[in-house]
Amino acid sequence: MSDQPETPSNSRNSHENVGAKKADANVASKFRSLHISETTKPLTSTRALYKTTRNNSRGATEFHKHVCKLAWKYLACIDKSSISHIEIEMKFGVITDKRTHRRMTPHNKPFIVQNRNGRLVSNVPEQMFSSFQELLRSKSENPSKCAPRVVKQVQKYTKDSIYNCNNASKVGKLTSWRCSEDLRNKELKLTYIKKVRVKDFLIRYPQSSLDAKISISLEVPEYETSAAFRNGFILQRTKSRSTYTFNDKMPLHLDLTKVTTTRRNSHQYTSHEVEVEMDPIFKETISANDREKFNEYMCSFLNASDLIRKAAERDNMLTT
């Protein structure tokens, strides 16, 4: 497999383009059907959710269960007073070896890469990014007349300034500070956040042009007077983000973001990011120590990841 993500070819004939549109519609349909319940309340049993993945391989289902177990292990250790600040998100891109900077060699099934060995380059090819935009925009702007609106889109333009603390401790290295500014509404106040990484899971997927990173973090509101914001920022990220939600039927939302990053005393570069974030309702399961219901939300989250990666594999979809 190539060390770089595969970008769909521009030399498609008209017949293939028709097939691609049908394949995209199929994925959109699966996104509509991927939900826990009509009210976002958890199922009474994880068994029903696992049945929805019966078309997946047994190995994929077992891997999802394994990820659920690992995630719960770290979430269960978070202090109750911090549960309201938990964020779980998944970014897509390519996992590269920290030593060689080449894409990690795949196994014959999904596996978790140790953080000390790899890192996720959270940038997808621009053409793939545009395909995602087109797919989701069509569902947002042209909902079915016979069905309720399935996808809702919100567009935001922001600038994040990222700060670092002069703290060499382990906790200090896992912490960053962010000041966010709304570029379209100057009347809104700046927001200040301290972000503490709890755990990252780097997932290398075989036979896929996209890998993923699941991040569990704490995002804690801060004040402008916090010591970290007295230093100069280490980088700025100007973002044009489209956020898609799914009628409260899926306990997650999808972000497509074009990012221009400027590092201090360095050059600018542009990236295209695709990420999924769990909606806050999952925090209720942690407060209640309800592992079974959390697994339902987490499996829905992982199933969405599978659909996103499938949508990226246009060549594979055209043959099905």
UniProtKB/Swiss-Prot annotation:
Per UniProt, the ranges with Polar residues bias are 1-12
Using the UniProt annotation, give all residue ranges assigned to the region (Disordered). Answer: 1-23
Query: EC?
Result: 3.6.1.74
Give the molecular function GO annotations.
mRNA 5'-triphosphate monophosphatase activity; polynucleotide 5'-phosphatase activity
Q: According to the record, how does the cofactor bind? A: Magnesium and/or manganese. Specific for polynucleotide RNA in the presence of magnesium, but becomes specific for nucleotide triphosphates in the presence of manganese.
> GO terms for biological process?
7-methylguanosine mRNA capping
SUPFAM superfamilies referenced in this protein's UniProt entry, alphabetically: CYTH-like phosphatases
Q: Which domain of life is it from?
A: Eukaryota
Compartments, record wording: Cytoplasm; Nucleus
Which InterPro entries does the annotation name?
A: Cet1/Ctl1, CYTH-like_dom_sf, mRNA_triPase_Cet1, mRNA_triPase_Cet1_sf
- Family (UniProt): Belongs to the fungal TPase family.
What is the protein named?
Polynucleotide 5'-triphosphatase CTL1
Give the organism the record lists. Answer: Saccharomyces cerevisiae (strain ATCC 204508 / S288c)
Read off the lineage from the record. Answer: Eukaryota, Fungi, Dikarya, Ascomycota, Saccharomycotina
Q: Which gene encodes it?
A: CTL1
